[in-house]
Curated annotation (Swiss-Prot):
Disulfide bonds: none annotated. It comes from Methylobacterium nodulans (strain LMG 21967 / CNCM I-2342 / ORS 2060). The lineage of its organism: Bacteria, Pseudomonadati, Pseudomonadota, Alphaproteobacteria, Hyphomicrobiales. Catalyzes amidations at positions B, D, E, and G on adenosylcobyrinic A,C-diamide. NH(2) groups are provided by glutamine, and one molecule of ATP is hydrogenolyzed for each amidation. The active site is at 336 (nucleophile), 434. This is Cobyric acid synthase.
Length: 489
């Protein structure tokens, strides 16, 4: 039996496509359906490791969790990881296949479509329902030739589309009606209905708006979805998810963790468990602002291009702020790329990251990193040292780091391998492990080191509870039975 398929496309970026697919995945999974999420092409530096040892966009990993299945490389067969303003690393079915500038990538698309359809068929063979998420805006008709992310995929796979608009940003009628106006008629015919997301207030006040959109487009009105504030508790994939929380007011008595927002910040969902703690204020420091003097911990996050981000870090004067923080007795933690920056030197003999082949590090750890072509992708478990507190997380990095401070590892993996480094005074640390703070035991340990305590809430269980409430929210406000009826079989 062939799975039914349905695609959620958007009138623009950040209209809530990922969230709606996650919520619908949980809603239909709770009905007993075997659900698989799918996004043909994603662009993000926030990635997750799959059981196959590949990588996919973090949003698809969350959607897989919502569907109550393990994430697979087939859920996001093409992942673009930006390395510059014009170029990206290209990951196909979980494996890095090269880098391409935007114009070059257009020539790649025809051959990538076969990989996309192969992964799609793989998921259809094991599911009752495949929920597909589009990318960006459905109305970008200038990119239609060779498209594999929106209507190009919908047409190639015969997947019907529901168009999602965001009323919170204004102009939702124009964005929905206007999308139909600019689409090729054959593309527009793939759209069977529409949803309006993030409504605030009395829904009866927009009843005539829903009717107007339906009349102008001929599409079925499938739901007016009220704003869901708890969405902020779910891991964000886009850097847009970091906006609006820069330099928040510190809660009285809270420990301050300062995080510089690097140009190519990656895997920043490492911060989410810390942001959920009432005893912590995570201060996201944007370019143009100094690292706050009141910080208890400066956390250097992951980076897609470590050398370029280190150069940008210095250009902001943050290296001076960080040195002053250390002299005041403050703590420093580097995660993955941030760990590499803390060393004496970073070398890139193969030019993996670009033209700069070597750069001096921040010199806070006596280690040297050499970039290597092979990427380490794996789920890991082990214990921190010397306290032997267990942890689970994942590795996703290029490069090997060695030096005297690495003889004092921060962690030890279950297979006995050491990871990370600790300075002689114990106040500067680095590790390659992502997801450390999502482990309740490790988060409690780090907060204790900062002189506070965890609220004791199970972070992962909290994510599932929010997904359940999101599913209930959508069941109330979306015509879910009608969505199933629209899905192609």
């Amino acid at each position: 039996m062939t799975a039914r398929t349905l695609m959620i496309q958007g009138t623009g970026s950040d209209v809530g496509k990922s969230l709606i697919v996650a919520g619908l995945s949980r809603a239909f999974a709770r009905r007993g359906l075997r659900v698989r999420p799918f996004k043909p092409q994603n662009m993000s530096n926030n990635a997750a490791v799959t059981a196959e040892g590949g990588e996919i966009g973090r949003a698809q990993a969350l959607q897989a969790r919502a569907a109550c299945v393990a994430p697979s490389v087939h859920m996001n067969p093409v992942l673009l990881k930006p390395q510059s303003e014009t170029g990206s690393q290209v990951v196909v079915q979980g494996r890095r296949v090269g880098t391409a500038k935007a114009r070059e990538y257009q020539a790649w698309k025809p051959r990538l479509l076969s990989a996309v359809l192969d992964s799609f068929d793989h998921l259809r063979a094991e599911a009752d329902l495949v929920l597909v998420e589009g990318a960006g805006s459905a109305s970008e008709v200038n990119l239609r030739a060779g498209d594999i992310a929106n209507m190009g995929f919908a047409r190639a796979s015969g997947t019907p589309v529901v168009l999602l608009g965001d009323i919170d940003r204004g102009g939702v009628i124009a964005s929905l009606v206007g999308t139909k106006a600019v689409l090729d008629p054959d593309d527009a015919a793939m759209i069977r209905g529409f949803l309006v997301n993030r409504f605030r207030g009395d829904p009866s006040l927009f009843a005539d708006g829903m009717a107007l959109i339906a009349a102008r487009t001929g599409w079925a009105a499938l739901g007016l979805i009220p704003h869901f504030p708890e969405a902020a508790r779910l891991p964000a994939e886009d850097v847009l998810g970091l906006k609006g929380s820069v330099r928040p007011s510190a809660r009285p008595g809270a420990r301050v963790i300062a995080v510089p927002v690097l140009p190519r910040i990656a895997n920043f969902d490492d911060l989410d468990p810390l942001r959920a703690e009432p005893g912590v204020s995570v201060v996201l420091v944007e370019p143009g602002r100094p690292l706050p003097a009141e910080a208890d911990l400066v956390l250097l996050p992951g980076s897609k291009t470590t050398i370029a981000d280190l150069i940008a870090f210095r250009a902001e004067g943050w290296d001076i702020d960080l040195a002053a923080h250390v002299r005041r007795g403050g703590r420093v933690l580097g995660l993955c790329g941030g760990y590499q920056m803390l060393g004496r030197r970073i070398e890139d003999p193969h030019g993996i990251e670009g033209e700069v082949r070597a750069v001096d590090g921040l010199g806070l750890l006596d280690v040297v990193t050499v970039m290597t072509p092979d990427k380490r992708l794996a789920a890991v478990t082990g214990a921190s040292l010397p306290d032997e507190t267990p942890f689970c997380g994942y590795e996703m990095h290029l490069g090997e780091t060695r030096g005297p401070d690495a003889a004092r590892p921060l962690l030890r993996f279950a297979d006995g391998r050491p990871d990370g480094a600790v300075s002689a005074d114990g106040r500067v640390c680095g590790t390659y492990v992502h997801g450390l703070f999502a482990d309740d035991r490790q988060r409690a340990l780090w907060l204790e080191r900062l002189g506070t305590s965890s609220a004791g809430e199970a972070y992962e269980a909290g994510i599932d509870a929010v997904l359940d409430r999101l599913a209930e929210h959508l069941e109330r406000h979306v015509a879910c039975d009608a969505l199933l009826a629209l899905a192609a079989g």
